[in-house]
């Protein structure tokens, strides 16, 4: 155990107090003035009771600190999660969760509301449900008084029911943004026989006007196509007709044929130089079939079951002529002559139809396109 702290003894403390009193009241004790005697008594009281008063102050401070520590511990135990709010939401429209639990010490400086009724103020009234009917459904006769009972009896005797027509004052209030919790109907208030709710699917005039404005701003697909067509420069582009499409198709087929011939030539050169990497079996077979059958002698014996084939079944034979592209231009010429005949017969039938000629207005002569492309 640590040694006890040795403080001044009571006798030495008493002597010290007497000396302090003598120093402060030197020459005043023998004076008989009332003020002097009160001053001497006050000094003696302060010096002799100073420790007692200081001890009392220390005890009060210790009690306050203990109470504060207890409140801090309780606050840490019951401390809610830090309250967050979106950017577009007013913090004063939300109740402070710390204040709700009695733990908020910010007071007026708190950015959140300390009004317990703020939730009721911010909640909007339902436009599609009559509050009187809702209260009537939730109401029971347990809390009725004599006045309420008489009112119910009189209503039952009169047999007066609510009309399904919507109250015109209610509609005006909704259209003018005046309807809310404190709105009262001019036609008798709660006793109004008309309904104070909008029917299902009803669209307000202000919303209808906004929808019409939005509909006017929208553009149809036909208008969008015409707009994009008008934006294109007709001088630098060729209009699409049957002749231009056939010429374009013929050009694409010729380009594909030339590309395939160039690729085949490149593959043959690779095979001649002994570079078989990246070559498929079909490419090797087309170049030389012996390159594929060289390993027949080295391969092992394989037993295979012969598949039964119907002798009367007709087989479609595919030979090298099937993939031959020679004379393609002649075939295209024949096809073009046949298609031109078909176009003439179709044009006779389309002459009877109403067609917007502006869509097919050809400003350039495309008869010499074939010769230009060749």
Swiss-Prot record:
Lineage start: Eukaryota, Metazoa, Ecdysozoa, Nematoda, Chromadorea
One Gene Ontology CC term in the entry: cytosol
Residue ranges, annotated region (Disordered): 1-20
Protein name: Zinc finger CCCH domain-containing protein 15 homolog
Family under the similarity heading: Belongs to the ZC3H15/TMA46 family.
Key words, A-Z: Metal-binding, Repeat, Zinc, Zinc-finger
Record flagged with keyword Cytoplasm: no
Species assigned in the record: Caenorhabditis elegans
Compositionally biased residues, Basic and acidic residues: 10-20
